A protein has these predicted regions:
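Basic/aromatic-rich interaction segments and small domains that mediate binding to polyanionic partners
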Residues: 27-52, 58
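Mixed-charge, Lys/Arg-rich low-complexity intrinsically disordered regions
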Residues: 1-17
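Intrinsically disordered, low-complexity, charged/polar segments
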Residues: 2-6, 49-68
Length: 68
C-alpha cells in the first residue's frame, strides 16, 4: 500500500482517470487507461484489466481520488 491516504470510496469504473490510485483484490494499483473493454491498472509487480462496474479508489486529504 502507498504511504498516506485518507480512506477509500467506491466509484463507477467510467469515472476513473489515468493515474488514480485504486485497490483491487487487496492490492494497490495505478489506473492506466480506461477503455470500453475495462480499466487497465498496474503496480511494480503486475498489470491487470479490471472489468467490474465499480472500483475502490484511495482518497487524498481533501476527500478526492488520489492521482499520481
Amino acid at each position: 500500500m502507498i504511504g498516506m491516504h485518507y480512506g477509500t470510496t467506491s466509484v463507477p469504473r467510467s469515472e476513473v482517470l489515468p493515474g488514480t490510485m485504486l485497490q483491487h483484490h487487496g492490492k494497490t494499483y495505478r489506473a492506466s487507461a480506461n477503455v470500453e473493454k475495462g480499466l487497465y491498472a498496474f503496480n511494480i509487480f503486475e498489470k491487470t484489466i479490471i472489468k467490474s462496474d465499480s472500483v475502490v479508489v484511495l482518497l487524498n486529504e481533501r476527500g478526492e481520488p488520489m492521482v499520481h
